Amino acid sequence: MPVMRLFPCFLQLLAGLALPAVPPQQWALSAGNGSSEVEVVPFQEVWGRSYCRALERLVDVVSEYPSEVEHMFSPSCVSLLRCTGCCGDENLHCVPVETANVTMQLLKIRSGDRPSYVELTFSQHVRCECRHSPGRQSPDMPGDFRADAPSFLPPRRSLPMLFRMEWGCALTGSQSAVWPSSPVPEEIPRMHPGRNGKKQQRKPLREKMKPERCGDAVPRR
């Protein structure tokens, strides 16, 4: 009976000897794959991949041909080159400056009729650039600013304009201040509740402005 107990062990030994030997190079490769180190993509490569350029994008056929919405196409979307990506300035947008037409053959399916092949022309973006969007530039105030917006609103992320709204002056490179050209209301009383619950009259806006906090005030004529 001891022979019967050793027989399964003998079979396992034979199976282990029949397996191919693993070279030490594969051991090192397996150990390297199991490490926790992650490759870091350098900044230049990240910037190049994310910058404004024409990339392949899937576009719905119906979005390019709205009049064909009652029909079905196969495939329902096509691969086109479209401008996408980031710009170095938040006021700039990735827009196409050169386009080209491409004609594709699709299967058009009509209700009640047999499917038929049709040729549709699509526009592809060839060259892209970062430019200002039309209708968002203002000759008086730089930055991301709409032309139809009120003139007293500061542009986004414009620190000098925030100083102008708060203190009545705008900081410049020479640390001087310039009074705003828009008229400042002086005789418009506004009532607001005081600490004791009674309404109190606010001081004129010009009295709150302290140009000495921004430097030597230079009145604008």
Swiss-Prot record:
Region of interest (Heparin-binding), residue spans: 193-213
Glycosylation site positions: N33, N101
Xref: InterPro entries: Cystine-knot_cytokine, PD_growth_factor_CS, PDGF/VEGF_dom, PDGF/VEGF_growth_factor
Free-text note on domains in this protein's UniProt record: Isoform PlGF-2 contains a basic insert which acts as a cell retention signal.
Protein name: Placenta growth factor
Statement: the UniProt record of this protein carries the keyword Disulfide bond: yes
Localisation: Secreted
UniProt PTM: N-glycosylated.
Origin species: Homo sapiens
